[in-house]
A protein has these predicted regions:
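Intrinsic-disorder/low-complexity, polar/charged segments enriched in Ser/Thr/Lys/Arg/Asp/Glu/Gln
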Residues: 8-16, 53-55, 72, 97-99, ...
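Short structured motifs
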Residues: 10-11, 41-45, 59, 85-87, ...
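Hydrophobic beta-strand positions in extracellular immunoglobulin-like domains
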Residues: 15-17, 60, 117-119
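Mid-length scaffold segments of soluble, non-membrane domains
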Residues: 40, 49, 54-68
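Short Pro/Gly-enriched beta-strand edge/turn motifs at strand-loop
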Residues: 25-28, 56-60, 82-88
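Hydrophobic ligand-binding cavity/cleft-lining segments
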Residues: 1-53
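Hydrophobic-ligand binding "helix-grip"
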Residues: 63-112, 118-120, 147-152
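A conserved amphipathic terminal alpha-helix motif
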Residues: 113-155
Length: 155
């Protein structure tokens, strides 16, 4: 995790998988079902699609220090399928900044999946208290995508 000015954090997590890249891509871009397998994502609605540009409304919720914390974002995503890159940025939402990418790389024995996120909380949001949670969420999101791809691969 990289600590940037003004309460901004940049995080990255990666995993190697035997799952082929096309199947990981299929799972990542199954926008209307992400909330069925991504932990703490309570809603994911495809608002608009035009070519490789997608608008997605998402809501997440989780307990933090005994309190329920919820956040909503309207994301714009750009799909770069030949390169297996999915970039996203917040158009509107409960953060000052929320952007990043998912990247899939082909490997001889499968693939690697990289998730990068830059987030800046709203004024008054104790980013120091949630940064460990953010780090854990990145890893659990990667594992959830791989697990869903594995489930679909076996079907």
């Amino acid at each position: 995790m990289e600590r940037l000015p003004s309460g901004t954090r940049r995080l990255a997590a990666q995993l190697r998988s035997e799952i082929p890249s096309p199947l990981l891509w299929e799972v990542l871009t199954d926008y209307e079902h992400l909330d069925q397998f991504i932990p703490n994502l309570t809603s994911s609605v495809l608002v608009h699609r035009e070519g490789e540009t997608v608008r997605l409304q998402q809501e997440g919720s989780q307990k933090l220090l005994g309190l329920r914390f919820s956040a909503q974002v309207l994301l714009e995503l750009n799909e770069f399928r030949p390169d297996w890159v999915l970039r996203f940025s917040m158009l509107k939402g409960d953060f000052r900044r929320f952007e990043g990418s998912w990247q899939i790389r082909d490997l001889p024995d499968g693939s690697s999946l990289l998730y990068e996120l830059t987030v800046q909380g709203c004024l008054g949001m104790p980013i120091g208290l949630i940064e460990e949670r953010l780090r854990d969420d990145l890893s659990s999101n990667l594992r959830a995508v791989e697990a869903e791809a594995r489930r679909r691969f076996k079907s």
